[in-house]
């Protein structure tokens, strides 16, 4: 019996078989590539953390090695990831940040030095406007404006902020030109991200001060 390739039943069966084959191939390719994709995502996170520690321009292998050298532990405090790091003998806490910009999600890592000031910062975005809001990621110069800024006051309140006009250069950073709403998102993200881990940051600063005092006493003796 000759197969009627023009019949509706043939077309439906043929199409169904093709769909099954394509779906199988896509699933196979996805599973085959997933470990590589996961590794790339993990490496990107490590690089962003290193950027916040002012360690940049490393290739994949170098970044992996440097991350293993400086990041001593990772924990989660009140829903916030905190990385305990050591850079040139200085204890540094890196806090992960997530928030909303003008057009989508934004994220970042803020490194806190043992003096309670910003050691470094790195920010990322999903869909901010190139040349405007995207500068939170693309402008290393803007990120470096955070370095040395005071993070909290004597009462433990977060005072680090991104503002349109700087009145207090010790705690404030100029917003990105032409991107006030994205900058406001960065400001909110910093405050929302730091509040849950403020106790840990303050404890780390106190411990560092105690260690410094003990070292000074030991040298004097």
What are these regions (language model features)?
Residues 2-221:
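Flexible, solvent-exposed loop/hinge segments and secondary-structure transition points
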